[in-house]
């Protein structure tokens, strides 16, 4: 009498279709429940894979799971992993303050703003605009926060250079010049004043 034990039945995944796992910053092994299958001989089989279970770069990936009953029967399943950051950086200061100086604005007068990002944490703004302004007027700095994952936030900041301080005469009250016959230009010293921006001004 011949007795044959021949398992020809493949494992059957518990879940017919594995769910897509999506995260914004990264996917770690703890985010991926290891799937299982039922087998007519072994019972419950835990899947194995040679693919990575940690993904930190933005993109779409595929994990190839395998259920092996040890009797020559294999079943495979694929699972999609997506790392997709869709959140823009959030400026720490919702509205940047206007910076006003009388004579000029230098880079040290302009604190570089920051934003918080769900993946990177703190992001420092960048700009292609000037940070030094010496001429009277109103200017706009365009700041950009870039998280490196395709998400950017912009902010504008106003810079004002406006001299509102009048020159101050060096001599508060100019002396009367008296001559008996005539007064010439050499008898009249040209008065001066000090200015907060220019320095010494000749009248």
What are these regions (language model features)?
Residues 1-203:
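Proline-threonine-serine-rich low-complexity tracts
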């Amino acid at each position: 009498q011949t007795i044959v034990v021949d398992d020809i039945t493949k494992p059957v995944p518990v879940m017919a279709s594995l769910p897509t796992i999506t995260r914004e910053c990264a996917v770690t092994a703890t985010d991926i429940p290891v799937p299982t299958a039922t087998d007519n001989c072994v019972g419950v089989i835990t899947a194995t894979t040679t693919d990575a279970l940690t993904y930190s770069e933005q993109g779409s990936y595929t994990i190839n799971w395998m259920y092996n009953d040890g009797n020559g029967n294999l079943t495979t399943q694929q699972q999609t992993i997506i790392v997709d950051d869709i959140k823009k950086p959030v400026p720490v200061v919702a509205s940047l303050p206007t910076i006003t100086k009388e004579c000029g604005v230098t880079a040290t007068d302009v604190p570089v703003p920051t934003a918080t990002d769900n993946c990177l944490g703190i992001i420092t703004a960048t700009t292609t605009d000037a940070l030094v302004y010496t001429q009277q007027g109103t200017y706009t700095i365009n700041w950009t926060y870039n998280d490196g994952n395709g998400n950017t936030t912009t902010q504008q900041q106003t810079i004002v250079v406006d001299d509102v301080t009048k020159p101050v005469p060096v001599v508060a009250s100019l002396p009367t010049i008296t001559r008996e016959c005539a007064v010439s230009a050499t008898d009249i010293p040209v008065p001066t004043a000090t200015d907060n921006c220019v320095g010494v001004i000749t009248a």
